[in-house]
Amino acid sequence: PSGYAVREAGPPAYYRPNSDNRRQGGRERLASTSDKGSMAVESAKETRYCAVCNDYASGYHYGVWSCEGCKAFFKRSIQGHNDYMCPATNQCTIDKNRRKSCQACRLRKCY
């Protein structure tokens, strides 16, 4: 690409509420567990995932939720004007464990 595109701000591409699927305000909520009646603290933080590799997102960078690794990769890619070539079929799987295996496909997922 000749430049870079910034995605429109809006609902996050990869938003997943915490595991119990209940939105909680900015506070922790106490809930009793059904077994033994003990109290447990549920986290109020909503988990967001990187739109590129699906790792945990560190923040909203360049218009999408992304991890620190993909944020830095995208920044280096647009500043260095790199021309990456996919050694396979331009359809490599980019996830947390394989995000470093193909820079061309990783950059393509950034756009």
Curated annotation (Swiss-Prot):
Name used for this protein in its record: Estrogen receptor
GO MF, one annotated term: zinc ion binding
Region (Disordered): 1-42
Pfam families found in the cross-reference section: Oest_recep, zf-C4
Name of the gene this protein is made from: ESR1
ZnF segments: NR C4-type: 50-70, 86-110
DNA-binding segment(s): 50-111
PTM section of the record: Ubiquitinated; regulated by LATS1 via DCAF1 it leads to ESR1 proteasomal degradation. Deubiquitinated by OTUB1. Ubiquitinated by STUB1/CHIP; in the CA1 hippocampal region following loss of endogenous circulating estradiol (17-beta-estradiol/E2). Ubiquitinated by UBR5, leading to its degradation: UBR5 specifically recognizes and binds ligand-bound ESR1 when it is not associated with coactivators (NCOAs). In presence of NCOAs, the UBR5-degron is not accessible, preventing its ubiquitination and degradation.
Function, in words: Nuclear hormone receptor. The steroid hormones and their receptors are involved in the regulation of eukaryotic gene expression and affect cellular proliferation and differentiation in target tissues. Ligand-dependent nuclear transactivation involves either direct homodimer binding to a palindromic estrogen response element (ERE) sequence or association with other DNA-binding transcription factors, such as AP-1/c-Jun, c-Fos, ATF-2, Sp1 and Sp3, to mediate ERE-independent signaling.
Listed PROSITE patterns: NUCLEAR_REC_DBD_1 (PS00031), NUCLEAR_REC_DBD_2 (PS51030)
